[in-house]
Structures are given as C-alpha cells and as structure tokens.
C-alpha cells in the first residue's frame, strides 16, 4: 500500500503530487519507537516538523530528537514548528534523552532544537549537556547536532563543540536570494559563518548542511549555494524537496523536482568535493543520518586531512 506523504500537510491548489512522492505504510519497529518516544517525554522533529520520512525512519528505529521545547522564537515560512513564547527549559531533559537513546539502541543519534533567542546562551549550554549525557550513557553512540545559528556567536558554538559531537550540522536551508523573504530571522551569510567557525574551533569535526529545493530558485543559484558551502569547508550536503506544511501560513511549492533532477544536483555537488552528498525528493537533514555519517567518516579517514 502507498501513503501520500502530505496527509497532514497542504500542497499548491490544483497541483497533484507526483508519483514519486508516495511512501509505504509503516512496518517493523515503528510501534516500538512510538512507545519509547512517548514514554520518554522527549519531542522529535519527526513529529513537530511533519517529516514525510517519519514512517520509514521510525520503522528502522531512527529518530531525530528536538530539545529545548517545541515552541520556536522564530517564524520561518517553510517550517511547521509552532512559533510562540517557549516554556522554561527542562533540566532533566538531557538524562531523559539519553535514556531514550539507550532504549532504542541507537548507534547514531541526531539532536536538533528550536531557536531559543530568549535564553542568554540561546540554549547552547543545554545542547552541550544533552551531548554529554548521551556519550556518558551510550559511549558507542555517535552524536550529530543540528542547532539554530546562535546568531553566529563564537562562545555558543564553542560551548557545543567542546561537548564533542561527532558531527555538527547547520542548514543553509535555501539559496541566498530567497532567504530574506522565507527565512526572515535567519541570514544566509550568517549560516555560512557558523560552519566556518565550527571548522576553526574543531578542525577534525565533520560538518554538514542542507538545502531545500522547490521554492523558486534557479539551478545556478543552487550551484552557487553548494560552492559557498564548500568555501567554508563543509563536508556533507543534503538536498531535498520542500513540501508545504499548510496552505495558508507557509510558502507555496513552486516546483516538484524529478528524481533525475536530484541526481543531476547531486552529481554537481559531488564534483565540488563534498565527502558525502544525499540528494533526492525525500532527503532531509537527518534522513539516513547514520549511513551518511559513516560514509563521511570513512572518506575523511582516507583523505589528506584526517578527521577521524
């Protein structure tokens, strides 16, 4: 059976979803993952952002955890996460998160967070404590962090890097021209500066970024974004189709890219020297994150600059 991925989302009026944007119904360990997540009391971006890969990933016991609450201080016109005054930070969240990772027996975990512009350190310290808790309880588990930009504050980025995540992921999200309109509280150049700063602070740490397509960008603009990421020595790139969370509050889908077009974008990105590139309709920042991480680490160990 097939399940249309936008069962809780909208898409442009009069525009039918392409055949490749269909997914099988959940199976395997889906129910087990649901149970562990619900009992732990931790949030996942899989649910909050209405990710189309939820069924597939949860069936494989893959989950991306979202810390620092489920309310964001920023409003981006592509994101399904609620914008509101955030709740106080839960001090026991790092341990609850680590317990969930242990129960799910994850070999690689992705932690993301809402933007917390209301906090003095924008949540960097709490983020670092979550990484430390997971490493303490699950020493064999590798940790990938996907934070907001911290306004590119070096002390915040440094605090998180010092916790020792194996991979630092920060998304560029879209091409530069579209950023002011669709991501008004973010800045394209600031996101590049975040990745540059990570490389300066932790030269051996893998870095990663993601770009959405279908918002009205041109191919040359995408190529420029990929080149900009390589200029700050970004190691890993993900490229995926933007899907409109709601009809009335989010930017419309301007184009559904074909699998062939994703292959072409991926080929161009690989020609620039990324260690790993994932490009496809369902690709998201954390999609197949464990496999992408292992591929990147293996290639990094074989390169001149050993990041192992």
Model-assigned labels for residue ranges:
Residues 73, 175-176, 244, 284:
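Alpha-helix N-cap/helix-start and coil->helix boundary motif
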Residues 1-64, 68, 95-99, 105, ...:
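Auxiliary Fe-S-binding modules of radical SAM enzymes
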Residues 80-97, 103-194, 208, 236-238:
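Core AdoMet radical
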Residues 56-59, 77, 81-84:
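Short functional micro-motifs and their immediate structural scaffolds
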Residues 51, 72, 76-79:
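Short cysteine clusters
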Residues 75, 119, 178, 247, ...:
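Glycine/Thr-rich phosphate-binding loops of Rossmann-like dinucleotide-binding domains
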């Amino acid at each position: 059976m097939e399940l249309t991925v936008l069962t809780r989302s909208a898409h442009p009026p009069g525009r039918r979803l392409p055949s490749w944007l269909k997914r099988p119904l959940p199976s395997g360990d889906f129910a087990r993952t649901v149970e562990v997540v619900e009992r732990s009391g931790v949030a996942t971006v899989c649910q909050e952002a209405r990710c189309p890969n939820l069924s597939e990933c949860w069936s494989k016991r893959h989950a991306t955890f979202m810390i620092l609450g489920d309310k964001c201080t920023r409003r981006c016109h592509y994101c399904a996460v609620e914008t509101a005054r955030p709740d106080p930070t839960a001090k026991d969240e790092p341990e609850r998160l680590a317990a969930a990772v242990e129960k799910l027996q994850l070999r690689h975990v992705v932690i993301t967070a809402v933007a917390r512009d209301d906090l003095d350190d924008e949540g960097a310290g709490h983020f670092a404590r979550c990484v430390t808790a997971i490493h303490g309880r699950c020493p064999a588990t590798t940790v990938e962090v996907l934070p907001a930009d911290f306004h590119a504050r070096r002390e915040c980025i440094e605090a998180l890097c010092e916790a020792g995540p194996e991979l630092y992921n920060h998304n560029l999200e879209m091409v530069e021209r579209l950023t002011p309109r669709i991501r008004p509280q973010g800045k394209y150049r600031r996101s590049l500066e975040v990745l540059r700063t990570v490389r300066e602070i932790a030269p051996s740490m893998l870095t990663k970024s993601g770009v959405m397509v279908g918002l009205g960008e041109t191919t040359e603009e995408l190529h420029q974004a990929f080149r900009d990421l390589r200029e700050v020595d970004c190691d890993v790139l993900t490229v995926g189709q933007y899907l409109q969370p709601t009809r009335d509050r989010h930017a419309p889908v301007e184009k559904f890219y074909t699998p062939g077009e994703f292959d072409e974008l991926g080929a161009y990105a690989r020609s620039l020297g990324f260690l790993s590139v994932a490009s496809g309709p369902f690709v998201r920042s954390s999609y197949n994150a464990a496999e992408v991480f292992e591929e990147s680490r293996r290639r990094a160990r074989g390169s001149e600059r050993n990041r192992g």
